[in-house]
Design a protein with these regions (language model features):
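Structural motif
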Residues: 58-59, 69, 188-189, 237, ...
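Glycine-rich phosphate/adenosyl-contacting loop at the front of the ribokinase-like
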Residues: 3, 7-12, 17-25, 29-112, ...
């Protein structure tokens, strides 16, 4: 191991290590350590304060990490009445789900989020860590409650109603983002959801534009999409469903039809987004961006449950982009990841591995996918 690699190893183990400590461990002078650090900084291998290393393989996911509760009705839902259900609890949150999915696809994923100093927060972080996600930048806030998401699904697995308690994400301030920026900027790709406050989203987009950092945005919902600034230059790709896309385009969903797909996508692109993916559920996906326009038909799927399918779609596209695929090529990874997830009752499908993704896509390409 050469000197530069020795120094990088020590810095990765402890970003706050002093030059004197490194010199003592390696057995060279402090001035020699300083010289190596200067060279590494010039190369861009380390950057920012605390010797943050530049990891060209990491995806930094910023946003929600919740405790998810799902109640699935055993029969047709009756309003104003007691309905028999089965209840499950799991880790959730859009950013967290995307990070875990990427980890399952053999990508290096990191999560920047906030949780409360409660059992839910402790459990969410520990479970996320166990599943291969770097949660070292997650912040535990004293006196706060971890975000919760409660969904009611009908007997077919379709969402009927959901409740969200996300007040804790108001604490994800621009100041917090600045404090964590060296770690954010060191990633190869940044993915954020709109659980972040409007001012934090605006600063994130501006900084990614200024520093030419690739940024994906998941709008989460049409209401939360309103938090995005009008100027979206700095957003590399965005992934709205139809309702969210109409909101971003400033057009009421009720006034739109299939003939408006190109118009809606064009209006979003006019705000500065380079690649737009509009998910249409059973109608597939519309792509519009620097690579042209295309409609991707849906993959025939026996749907068990829809929760998490959108997060898997974003993760699949990120997987493709990280492996140098075009955005159109990456859309097939996204559709395949969603296809696999829809066939499970998990928000993050344990079956969704890199091998399964590649094999399923190969079968689909050959036209012999039997699922």
């Amino acid at each position: 191991m050469d000197r530069e690699q020795q120094i990088l190893t020590l810095i990765r183990q402890n970003p706050f290590i002093s030059q004197h400590e490194m010199a003592s461990i390696i057995g060279i002078s402090r001035s020699a350590v300083a010289g190596y650090i200067a060279a590494l900084t010039k190369k861009g291998t380390i950057r920012g304060r605390a010797y943050v290393t530049s990891d060209e393989n990491t995806v930094m996911c910023i946003g929600g990490a919740n405790l998810d509760s799902k109640a699935t009705s055993k029969q047709a839902i009756r309003l104003a009445s007691s309905n028999p259900v089965t209840v499950t609890e799991s880790c959730g949150g859009v950013a967290r789900n995307i990070a875990e999915t990427l980890a399952g696809l053999a990508c290096q994923a990191a999560l920047l989020t906030v949780v409360g100093d409660d059992k839910a927060g402790q459990w969410v972080l520990e479970e996320t860590r166990k599943r291969g996600v770097d949660v070292s930048q997650a912040i535990v806030l004293q006196g706060e409650n971890t975000g919760t998401y409660t969904a009611l699904l009908d007997a077919t697995g379709e969402m009927f109603l959901a409740f969200a308690n996300m007040d804790i994400y108001d604490k994800c301030t621009p100041a917090l983002l600045r404090d964590k920026w060296p770690h954010v900027a060191s990633a190869k790709l940044i993915i954020a959801d709109t659980n972040l406050p409007a001012e934090t989203l605006a600063e994130l987009i501006d900084r990614c534009k200024e520093e030419n950092l690739p940024l994906f945005i998941d709008p989460v919902s049409s209401e939360k999409a309103k938090k995005l600034p009008q100027d979206l230059h700095g957003v590399t790709a965005i992934f709205p469903n139809w309702e969210e896309a109409c909101q971003l385009a400033g057009i009421a969903p009720s006034s739109s039809s299939s003939s408006d797909y190109s118009t809606i996508a064009g209006a979003i692109r006019a705000r500065g987004v380079r690649h737009v993916f509009i998910t249409l559920g059973s109608q597939g996906v519309i792509y519009a961006g620097e690579e042209g326009e295309r409609h991707f038909p849906p993959i025939p799927t026996k749907v068990v449950e829809v929760t998490g399918a959108g997060d898997a779609f974003v993760a699949g596209i990120a997987y493709g982009v990280m492996r140098q695929s075009t955005y159109m090529e990456s859309c097939m990874y996204g559709l395949t990841a969603s296809h696999i997830t829809l066939q499970t009752d998990q928000s993050v499908a344990s079956e969704l591995t890199e091998e399964r993704l590649q094999q399923t896509l190969l079968h689909l390409t050959k036209g012999d996918e039997s699922q």
